[in-house]
Amino acid sequence: MLFPKRLIVWGVLLILSLSQFVLYLPATTCTNSKGLRLCAPQFTITVIGGSSTANEFIASVREFLRLISYLTIDMGWSNEFTDPSVYEDENLVDTFQPDKVFELNYFGFCKRSNKSKVYCTSNENYGMDVLEVLVRDVGIQLGNISTTRSNETKKFGDSLVLTYRLALTSIRDFLKHDKHTGNALSKALIGSPDPNVKGASPTKNYLKGVNLAFILMMFNGMVFYFAVLEIIVGFLSICVVSAFGGALSVGKRHRLFPILLKSSSSILVVIATLTILCNIVYLIALKTLEPEEVTDVGSDNAAVHTTGWELLKVNVGSGFIMGLARYAIQWVLLVLAFLAANHYKAKPKKSDKYTEDTSNSPSPDLMEK
C-alpha cells in the first residue's frame, strides 16, 4: 500500500513540474517568420504620439525615415527598383505609423499590421527593449528596400541596433557633460527655450528621454538573463523531481533527494518572482510612456504628462498571462515539494540517537570527581 501512495505523490509533483515547464514555451515564441508564425507576447505596443515633445519627435523621425528610404532606393543594389510606385508611402519605412503593432517577447518580436503578421525575428540578447525593437524594424525594412538578398535584412537590423546603442551612450554622456557648461552646445543644436513658454526646456526634455532610453536598455538586458536562468532552473526542477520519484521507488526514506527537491523548488520560485516583478516594473515604465486619455474634450484641463515622452499605446499580451499562470503552478509545486520532502526524509536512527546521548552525558569518572 505504501508504494502506490508514494507513486501518486511523485506523479502529482511530476505533472506540476512538467506543466510549469511547458508554460515556458510561449516565452520562446515570436522569433521565426518561417512556417507558422507563433507569438504569445508579453506586451504589445503601438507608436501613437501624445505630448508635444513626443509628437514633434515622431514627426521628425517619420520625415527622416522617408528621406532615408528614398536614398536607400536610389542607391539600391538591385535593378528591380525602376517602377515609380516603389516611392509611394506604403513601400517606405513605416515603423512609426499608428497602424503597426509590435508584439514583444523575451527572445524576439513580431510586427503586425491589420491583424496579419508581417514578420517575426529574434532580438538577440536585448530582450524586450521597445526602442531597440523599433530601431531593428527600421534596419530590417531598409534591408528589404536596398537588396533582394534575404539574408542581408538581419544584418541591417543588427548593425542599426549596435549603432543605436553606441549613439545612445554617446548622446547621454554629451548631454550630462554639457550641463556643466550651461548647456551651450545643446542650445546651439536644439535651440534656446522660449521664456514665454512654461514647462521644462527642450534640453531637459531630451536629456530625460535619453536617460529613460538608457535605463530601458540596461533593464531589459537584465530581464533577458533572468528569463534564461528561470528556464534553466525550471528544467533542472523536472530532473530533480524525476530523480526523487526514482528514489521513492527504491525506498521510502531518503536524505539527499528531499534536500534537492526543496532547494530546486525554492530557487525556481525566487527567480520566477524576480522575473515577474521585473515584468511588472517594465509594464509600469511603459505605461508612463502612454498618453492619458482626456475624458472631456472641451475642458480647459489638459492631460498631465508624466515624462514628456508619451508616445506609446501598451497592452498586456497572452504570454504575460501565461507567465502568471506558470508562477501560480510553481508556488503550488513549492508547497507540495516541501510537504513531500519532509514526509519522506530519513529520520535519525536509534543508534545515532544513542551515540548522541552518550556523547552528551558526563562520564562516570567526572561524576566521581
Swiss-Prot record:
The keyword Cell wall biogenesis/degradation does not apply. Residues 28-220, 287-319 are lumenal. Disulfide bonds: none annotated. The keyword NADP does not apply. The chain crosses the membrane at residues 7-27, 221-241, 266-286, 320-340. Residues 348-369 are annotated as: Disordered. It is a multi-pass membrane protein. One of its GO terms (cellular component) is prospore membrane. Residues 1-6, 242-265, 341-369 are cytoplasmic. One of its GO terms (biological process) is sporulation resulting in formation of a cellular spore. It is found in: Prospore membrane; Endoplasmic reticulum. Keywords: Endoplasmic reticulum, Membrane, Sporulation, Transmembrane, Transmembrane helix. Belongs to the SMA2 family. Involved in spore and ascus formation. Required for the efficient assembly of the precursors of the prospore membrane to a continuous prospore membrane. This is Spore membrane assembly protein 2. It comes from Saccharomyces cerevisiae (strain YJM789). The gene is SMA2.
